[in-house]
UniProtKB/Swiss-Prot annotation:
Protein name: Peptide chain release factor 1
Role this protein plays: Peptide chain release factor 1 directs the termination of translation in response to the peptide chain termination codons UAG and UAA.
Modified residues (N5-methylglutamine): 235
InterPro entries: PCRF (IPR005139), Pep_chain_release_fac_I (IPR000352), Pep_chain_release_fac_I_sf (IPR045853), Prokaryotic/Mito_RF (IPR050057), RF-1 (IPR004373)
Gene name in the database record: prfA
Lineage of origin: Bacteria, Pseudomonadati, Pseudomonadota, Betaproteobacteria, Burkholderiales
Length: 360
């Protein structure tokens, strides 16, 4: 283990002892915000320090076994102990290196998932609906909460565009690799000749700002228009201008919300989505240089960047970024994304390790 890494782990061990002392004090819950910060930090550091304690024990076992090697009668036993200790040290050091990788500050945040139909007309809109269901089913498996923010249904079903808010611990960390172009190959229900059609949708996954104020938005930079909602909604739908369109003039970002009968609620939702879009834009601009110098799974944020193909006749899904093909398309479309996400997270961690190696 490198000296720099061991020094960092020693610092974390000291910090954990400090946290244990702070959390054991009688008045610890007097400031609930501070208490939450301390417990969150404790939860993050605890497993790392525990792993480090196991590594130090393995190191002590290695030194003890080396001393036994001098005794001829104990040599076979000592060699077995030495091998076991070194194996444990190697495994624990590798796990610790992964645990110490830089954390994405957005990983724990709630998210907005925006799906837009692309090339392929009605078939693309239908696939947008399929993708939405896939993410909703995955969210259900994680016991996350889902809220529809905005939807623009297509004539034959599916969506021209849809935005949902997914709230749950680690939502961004699990779904941040979904941004990009998703291509589908299948025989549409309206196809009489049995020909396979190719269409596409784009997905954008944006971390939710903790508060609207986290992203600086000058009210003077906003143009807010109201109009009558369209689509399902019964008699009420054409009576009031409850739908809201918010335009952020400096960036040209436009958000429409019309799902609620309350203009106030639609405006509030639109501003939340707008804040997330601006935050997402700033994030990708900030990382543009990094994305240009090395391949990154999160990419440039370019919607046209094709990341995945869903081939229904062959029952396969291929993620082009990591050259992963899974022949379990039906399960994937039903929200079984664990294997795919685990592979993407693993590749991302490998990228981070490589970049740290380059920096050293």
């Amino acid at each position: 283990m490198k000296t720099s890494m061991q020094s960092k782990l020693d610092q974390l061990t000291t910090r954990l002892a400090e946290l244990n002392d702070l959390l054991s004090r009688e008045n610890v819950t007097a400031d609930l915000d501070q208490y939450r910060k301390l417990t969150r930090e404790h939860a993050e550091i605890g497993p790392v320090v525990e792993h480090y304690a196991q590594w130090r024990q393995a190191r002590a076992d290695e030194l003890a076994a080396q001393e036994l090697l001098a005794d001829a009668s104990m040599r076979d036993f000592a060699e077995d102990e030495l091998r076991g200790a070194r194996d444990r040290m190697g495994r624990l050091a590798a796990e610790l290196q992964t645990m110490l990788l830089p954390k994405d500050p957005n990983d724990e945040r709630n998210i907005f998932v925006e799906i837009r139909a692309g090339t392929g007309g009605d078939e693309s809109a239908l696939f947008a609906g399929n993708l939405l269901r896939m993410y909703l089913r995955y969210a259900e498996r994680q016991r996350w909460q889902v809220e529809m923010m905005s939807e623009s249904p297509s004539d034959l079903g599916g969506y021209k565009e849809v935005i949902v808010r997914i709230a749950g611990y680690g939502a961004y960390s699990r779904l941040k690799f979904e941004s990009g172009g998703h291509r589908v190959q299948r025989v549409p229900a309206t196809e009489t000749q049995g020909r396979i059609h190719t269409s596409a949708c784009t997905v954008a996954v944006m971390p939710e700002a903790d508060e609207i104020g986290e992203v600086e938005i000058n009210p003077a930079d906003l143009r807010i228009d109201t109009f009558r909602a369209s689509g399902a909604g019964g008699q009420h739908i054409n009576k009031t201008d409850s739908a809201v369109r918010v335009t952020h003039i400096p960036t040209g970002i436009v958000v429409e919300c019309q799902d609620d009968r309350s203009q106030h609620k639609n405006k509030d939702r639109a501003l939340k989505v707008l804040a997330a879009r601006i935050k997402d834009k700033q994030y990708h601009e900030q990382h543009a240089k990094e994305a240009a110098t090395r391949k990154s799974l999160i990419g440039s944020g370019d919607r046209s960047e094709r990341i995945r193909t869903y081939n229904f006749p062959q029952g396969r899904m291929t993620d082009h970024r990591i050259n992963l093909t899974l022949y379990k398309l039906e399960q994937i479309m039903d929200g079984d994304l664990d294997e795919l996400i685990a592979a993407l997270v693993s590749e991302h961690q490998a990228e981070l390790l490589a970049s740290l190696g380059d920096a050293e």
